[in-house]
Amino acid sequence: MGDSPKCLRDSLREALRRREDKLCRRKLTILPSSSVDFSSNDFLSLSTSPAYRARFLDILQQAPPLHPFASGGSRLLDGNSAYAEELENFIAAFHNAPSGLLFNSGYDANVGVFSSIPQPGDLIVYDELIHASAHEGMRLSRAGKRIKFPHSSPDGLRAVLQAEITADPRLLQGRRNVFIAFESVYSMDGDVAPIREFVEIVDQLLPYGNGYFLVDEAHATGVFGPRGSGVVQELGLEDRMFVRVHTFGKALASHGAIVLCCADTRDYLINYARSLIYTTALGFPFLASIRAAYELLVEGKTEQLQHKLGQLIAHFRTGLDNLNHKDSSTFEVEHFTNSPIFSLRSSVPRVLASVCQEQGYTVRAIMPPTVPAGKERVRVCLHAGNTVEEVDGLLETIATWLQRMEKQKARL
């Protein structure tokens, strides 16, 4: 008799044990409410904004009596509403887009776009650090080939495209579509993609206009660009992007996402994006919260928050630059100008994160598989609601930890 088969629970426990051994097992945690937030994506601090809350409640109160809070079904069945379509038009107008289509999350939006739009034989070229949701969508895609290029590298994109064009002349002839996918702002290092350079390269190598850009603006929404409209609008490149995805769960303190695109693409997604078709649509409270956030953006009511956030970013960056540390393996800062996201690289990120948390500052150690091995870091996110005193307190905590680490190394 052979060995009896493992039960499912044994297999699950073994998988978790392997992650535990690699120090990369994920767990849900709850930190004290008194902790200072330097971790969340609530960049504008709208989630605690009295102005945002008042606008949201006002929209709810304006609804007719007995207006249903739940959508009741998929957008294609009973879940659609005039309010949802008006909201899509309102957001699309703000972003200078022909039309938009709401999804329940940025994850659903990316899965819907990547899984349905590329056609058989098409090529997807994507930044190696693109969101996991894009990878999920690509796995479901009918595209003939998917190939990554080095992170935010114009030369890397050029090399990949040139190699593919050489291998398949139909690309140069405009007989096959090429989708170029990237994020405008990346979540781990906060760096901004060289979008203008990408456009120039695609124009040079694909002169028949068969290169289509798919850009995820999740971490740019509300923070970058005029009135928080995003990096693409800051560059004036709206017309060059085939699809833009803006999400509402970060700086806008709500939930969901919108795919900005032309009317034909919107209609195609309604017919083919399974992550839209086979899920219950957003209910009225979610739509109202999205509307409240965008009304504040449109009216310029968040520009002061953007300005304050920018001041805190500059202050924190200066403080980090002034830290007296000698060993880059212990501590190294990666930061892109004007980004609220800071990457504090360390060989012991869990130790640094724990020290900060003990002092009342919420930061997170980011470990593999979320980031590649050797790229571990403590991720710090600044918010408009943070104070200079809180930022200085975090800097002091980091400085004290660095001094202790250097003394320990000196004894060795």
From Swiss-Prot:
Its cofactor is pyridoxal 5'-phosphate. GO terms for molecular function: 8-amino-7-oxononanoate synthase activity; pyridoxal phosphate binding. The modification N6-(pyridoxal phosphate)lysine is found at residue 250. Keywords: Biotin biosynthesis, Pyridoxal phosphate, Transferase. The keyword Coiled coil does not apply. InterPro entries: Aminotransferase_I/II_large, AON_synthase_class-II, PyrdxlP-dep_Trfase, PyrdxlP-dep_Trfase_major, PyrdxlP-dep_Trfase_small. Pyridoxal 5'-phosphate binds at residues 106-107, 187, 219, 247. It comes from the Eukaryota. Pathway: Cofactor biosynthesis; biotin biosynthesis. GO terms for cellular component: peroxisome. Homodimer. Belongs to the class-II pyridoxal-phosphate-dependent aminotransferase family. BioF subfamily. 8-amino-7-oxononanoate synthase; part of the cluster involved in the biosynthesis of biotin (also known as vitamin B8 or vitamin H), a water-soluble vitamin that functions as a prosthetic group of many carboxylases, such as acetyl-CoA carboxylase and pyruvate carboxylase. Catalyzes the decarboxylative condensation of pimeloyl-[acyl-carrier protein] and L-alanine to produce 8-amino-7-oxononanoate (AON). This is 8-amino-7-oxononanoate synthase. It comes from Emericella nidulans (strain FGSC A4 / ATCC 38163 / CBS 112.46 / NRRL 194 / M139) (Aspergillus nidulans). The gene is bioF.
